[in-house]
Amino acid sequence: VGGIVDANQNVHNLNSYFTLNANKKFGDFAVTGSIGNEFNSNHSFSSSVFGYGLVVPTFNNIKNALTYVPSTGTSNTKLFGVFADVAVEYKKFLSLNVKARNDWSSTLAADNNSIFYPAVSGSFVLTEAFSALKNDKINLIKFRASVGEVGKGAPAYGTDSYYVGAGASDGFGPVINFPFNSQAGFTLSNTAGNNKLTPEFTREVSFGADLAFFNNRLTVDATLYNRNTRNVILYVPVSGTSGVTSALQNAGKLSTKGLELLVSGTPIKT
């Protein structure tokens, strides 16, 4: 009657982040830049034993069970990235920012594990370029635009197919799990891996404006964006006659468009 589980999980994460920054002025131009690298190593291990059919009720010990079903799980992933960032500002009213990053992910096959994604953004402050526009009523008029990408790898071990503990059922009675009658059994997982997976990318284009009025007592922040994700990594159903029921593929696209508007005000100030 009843059951018990004895489980253990260990997680080890190692992260390092290094940057080198510099800045310099050239007349009316101010230039800042940075380069760096990032390293992430993630390891987890879990083990458990499920016991079924307790001999003595309420005696919570795994040895009190008639049958045992052991299981383990492990995950090791690594990611190494390098990046660079350069920003140029002219007379505090015109700016341009260029970024680039390249990651190498262990969750993708060696031929496809490089993930490069750049980004460019710029802004123009109208009230700084034309100081006559700036007064007690109009404090800030700023326009901005950006386009950039973000990439990521696949789920851990998604590039290969693996064997898992076997089980059987007729749909009416209880499920028979191995080991059974002192015999171990394994079967190919119902999910097929895919060593042709490529990185998943999300590109976003945005245009916006920042406005401030009446000595900054009324501010408006508006952003119009268009976000598209390609090569979405999904578990896709496949015919069971192939020996599996799903396969990991670059099979999806997502598109999002929207307007973000934030209005803040201080109607009464003492």
Region locations from a protein language model:
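Extracellular/periplasmic, surface-exposed regions of secreted and cell-surface proteins
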Residues: 1-270
